[in-house]
Amino acid sequence: YTSSFSTNDRTRAFLKVQDGCDYKCTYCTIPLARGISRSDALENVIENAKNIVAQDIKEIVLTGVNIGDFGKGEFGTKKHEHTFLDLVKALDAIEGISRIRISSIEPNLLKDETIAFVGQSKGFVPHFHVPLQSGSDIILKRMRRRYLSQLYIDRVKAIKKAMPHACIGVDVIVGFPGETEEEFLKSYRFLVDLDISYLHVFAYSERPNTAAASMGEVVPQHVRAKRSKMLRGLSVKKRHYFYS
């Protein structure tokens, strides 16, 4: 593992804490490209964070391929020597950090303890970006995601209970193989009912060497585009409601 951080301006730095992924989502090439899940040592992360603070940078964004899996591979083993919650607590204790932001975290790895700590922390901003990909359990299973829609509902409710004004962003893929009109509308209605702030919408794109690329029931490109437009319109409404 190569410890690193980068700065794009004088106000924000991106602190990499983890790389790789052990998940087998059927649409994703990241495990092939980035390898197994592995983490920086906690002491290295803290040292990097302190170096960022010394540059008078006000915000740190935690990044990684699957940051909720932090701790796995930390010392060259498959064990979680430290947890993501350990990381969050250690960073919050550093003096001089104005804001800390979690870039994106899988819903099944976003634990109640982490949500509760962020809610009362001095440095973490009340912002969560939590990939969903589909509100249809049938499609989630075809994607080989590690949760179903009810778990996602529970995560959103837990965030809002701890931080009523929290901003919650969602990743969604439309046009995945097997996504019938019925399943898409199920996903659309699911998102309408969720107390979220914005959507990042992606039309499914076939990737070589993925299980999904050889699945049947391919959704036509024009249907993917139509569904993307619908969800982007919903995102505009969600964002307007959140900020109004």
PLM region spans:
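A generic short-segment signal for beta-strand/edge and adjacent turn/coil regions
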Residues: 30, 95-100, 108, 219-226
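Contiguous mid-protein beta-loop-alpha structural module that forms a pocket-lining wall or clamp
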Residues: 179, 193-196
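Proteins enriched for Cys/Gly/acidic motifs involved in redox and nucleic-acid/cofactor modification
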Residues: 1-71, 83, 113, 128, ...
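Anionic-ligand binding region
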Residues: 211-218
